[in-house]
Amino acid sequence: MKLTSKGRYAVMALVDLARFDNINPVSLRDISLRQGISLDYLEQIFSKLKKNEIVKSIRGTQGGYVLNKNPNDIKLTNIFHAVDERVKTVQCKKESKKGCNGKATKCITHNLWDELEMHINTFFENKSLKDLLINNKETRV
């Protein structure tokens, strides 16, 4: 199982935004510089986050982005869904007639990977942006 850079960067950028948006709106340029993420890539990500009402943009010379919700109400699953990130541990589609291995059956370890996927998704559903902020404060020196 692997998350794409889109999902990882969305989470990183939102943690960065949450750290600073209580002062003023945060520019994507500032997030880009602090996190080492391409500005063009951030613009694509934030377009999706805005469309899904996780962030809102503020126009003007002091403009930028702010969270649209309390960090405690933004779960990692919300972020992943907003940027079209899906956590998958199996390659097959549940509704596929071909099964996992191109046959009409599931692979021998299918249920193991299905259960793992369920645990991972539950973990992400229970982790909020606020949790990551708290964890970040504890680990920073």
Task: Name what the model sees in each region.
Residues L76, C92-V141:
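C-terminal regulatory/oligomerization modules of transcriptional regulators
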Residues I54-Q62, V66-L67:
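Beta-hairpin "wing" of winged helix-turn-helix
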Residues A10-N22:
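Short amphipathic alpha-helical interface segments
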Residues I45-K50:
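Basic amphipathic alpha-helical segments that dock to polyanions
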